[in-house]
Amino acid sequence: MKYYAVIDTNVLVSAVLKWNSVPGNIIDLAFNDVIIPLVNQEILNEYKTVLLRPKFHLTELIVTDILDEMKARAIDVSEEHLDVELPDPKDRVFYEVTMKARESEDAHLITGNIKHFPTKPFIVTPRQMLDLILESSNE
């Protein structure tokens, strides 16, 4: 089974910094075509900008490799402007892409900052998404 998901930047960063973690499992599933990442150019730009912050000590080559891998497996989705207030305005695109994708797919938004988004059953933490996938595979 394939799962469609917008992956918040904090999940990607956590995975890169600690591969043997729940966020690392999420990205591993994305790189192995179990989770289909949903992106647009703004999301990809955010990934790059954050991963290249000096505090993460990642080279441009490493970041490019990560993003190339993500893009190779991702579906590009145009966001649709929604009238929703979020604590962090940069989170808006992740929510908007998720909502647009949900018009045709059972898409999720995977985030470590669940409190920054409206309470919806399709907005999940990395652990919740992993549990959903594991439960489905046991059925």
What are these regions (language model features)?
Residues 69-112:
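Active-site neighborhoods of divalent-metal-dependent phosphate/nucleic-acid chemistry enzymes
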Residues 103-139:
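Acidic, PIN/NYN-like endoribonuclease modules and their adjacent C-terminal/linker elements
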Residues 1-20:
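Metal-dependent nucleic-acid phosphoesterase active-site entry motif
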Residues 11-12, 43, 94, 115-116, ...:
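Alpha-helix capping/helix-boundary segments
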Residues 7, 22-52:
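PIN/NYN-family metal-dependent endoribonuclease catalytic core
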Residues 60-71:
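Short, well-structured alpha-helical segments
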